[in-house]
């Protein structure tokens, strides 16, 4: 009789499958990147996933986010993702936290976890998560700027200090220096030069990002999410 993980076990072995079943991964940001990371880990035998995001599924998510369908509009992203994972991996424990990640979120690290995926697009929260993970000794992989790009083949995994062509990475490097954070930060990033989106979409917006939202395809965010999941997966199966 076929089992859900039998093809995976052929590749990694029974001992690795057992390690995956005992692992817990925190994913912050269930978006174009984080949604695909959660999907991949849910299908790869991870025993426990903690999903954090305060947003609801919106029409503008339909072109790229795995959780976005006409049936899920206006629903919590974390709850939609959790239901999706339970539909194909009922043994995976999925905990949902419908809130923005900030400095008050450190209680999350009061429980055992094996890895963190940072799929946050707000710089201050991104650095807060990176610092918290480092402080608690939990490895973290961060996704950098994936908007305004077309080519998923230009993604790579290095550390933050080796990035280029990425305005978000540049701003994060500056914040890291100001905070005196010296640890190497593993990141998934794109070598592709980003497209400049200068079309006013929401004149009533309060911020530049609201007025000029980033352009996005499915290709790059999805590939970034799968890359983050792959980094985590490989670390977990090798950790025994």
Show the residue positions of the predicted features.
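Hydrophobic/small residue at the entry helix of a nucleotide-binding pocket
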Residues: 33-34
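Acidic/polar active-site rim loop that often engages polyanionic ligands
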Residues: 59-67, 148-159
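Conserved SAM/SAH-binding loop
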Residues: 97-105
């Amino acid at each position: 009789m076929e089992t859900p993980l039998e093809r995976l076990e052929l590749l990694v072995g029974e001992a690795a499958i057992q390690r995956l079943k005992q692992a817990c991964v925190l994913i912050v940001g269930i978006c174009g990147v984080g949604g695909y990371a959660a999907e991949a880990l849910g299908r790869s035998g991870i025993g426990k996933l903690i999903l954090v995001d305060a947003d609801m599924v919106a029409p503008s998510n339909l072109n790229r986010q795995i959780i976005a369908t006409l049936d899920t509009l206006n629903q919590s992203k974390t709850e939609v993702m959790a239901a999706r994972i339970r539909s194909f991996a009922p043994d995976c424990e999925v905990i949902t936290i419908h809130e923005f990640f900030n400095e008050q979120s450190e209680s999350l690290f009061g429980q055992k976890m094996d890895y963190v995926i940072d799929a946050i697009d707000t710089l201050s929260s991104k650095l807060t998560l990176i610092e918290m993970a480092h402080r608690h000794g939990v490895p973290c992989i961060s996704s950098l700027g994936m908007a305004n790009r077309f080519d998923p083949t230009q993604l790579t995994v290095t550390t933050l200090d080796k990035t280029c062509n990425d305005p978000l990475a540049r701003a994060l490097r500056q914040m890291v220096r100001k905070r005196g954070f010296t640890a190497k930060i593993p990141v998934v990033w794109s070598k592709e030069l980003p497209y400049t989106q200068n079309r006013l979409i929401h004149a009533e917006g309060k911020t530049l990002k609201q007025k000029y939202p980033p352009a996005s395809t499915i290709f790059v965010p999805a590939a970034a999410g799968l890359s983050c999941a792959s980094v985590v997966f490989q670390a977990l199966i090798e950790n025994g």
